[in-house]
Design a protein with these regions (language model features):
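A beta-rich soluble binding module of mature secreted/lumenal proteins
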Residues: 2-195
Length: 195
């Protein structure tokens, strides 16, 4: 192939690439704009939430809008009743008193049409908190949940141990910033967490 033929093939390839980009770029920008502007058309499904909790692996509270008083907080499923969508967990964390262990129960219910499923977390002392499952990423095995505590809206991002063994959940961090816009973000997990 002489120089003129190489240049001609190069020009054709570049023209094809430019035309492809011209058609794809508006679509890509629209998807990006929806995410950055907090597109609210996505509604978490009951199947996504139940799949997230069906794991036998530890689930870490990776980031929260509440303060960083508890570090390395994780939950591990101890039992489940699929007929009632009830999951029992052992919770461990580190705080200024040591490494407490406590227990909690998650109850899921079908949400109304176009609404996320209901989720109630009951602590061992009987205190209940209603959570809203907001977003899930099946690739990063993470979920973002919102709730109200002391009259203030809060957010938490939970990530499967299988994910954070190998990677940092970048997509989930981005979604946390969108779903929990304007809230503080404290990372509670680090690779030095003991369990």
């Amino acid at each position: 192939m002489d120089t003129a033929q190489v240049f001609s093939e190069y020009t054709k390839t570049m023209l094809h690439l430019m035309l492809t980009l011209a058609f794809l770029l508006p679509s890509l920008l629209a998807i990006s704009d929806d995410s950055e502007n907090g597109d609210n058309t996505y509604v978490a499904s009951l199947d996504e939430v139940t799949s997230f909790f069906k794991t036998s692996h530890k689930i870490w509270l990776y980031a929260t809008s509440e303060g960083p008083q508890r570090q390395c907080l994780s939950i591990t499923k101890s039992s489940e009743d699929q007929s009632t969508r009830t999951y029992n967990f052992t919770q461990q964390y580190i705080d200024n008193t040591g490494t407490p262990t406590t227990y909690l129960t998650v109850n899921l219910s079908q949400g109304e049409s176009e609404k996320p499923p209901g989720m109630t977390v009951t602590m061992a002392d009987g205190k209940e908190t209603a959570y809203t499952p907001e977003k899930f990423d099946v690739n990063e095995q993470c979920g973002i949940f919102s709730f109200t505590r002391a009259g203030k809206q809060q957010c938490e991002m939970y990530v499967s141990h299988e994910t954070i063994r190998w990677t940092t959940p970048q997509s989930c961090f981005k979604e946390f910033d969108i779903v929990c816009k304007g809230m503080e973000k404290h990372q509670l997990y680090s690779s030095s967490c003991p369990w």
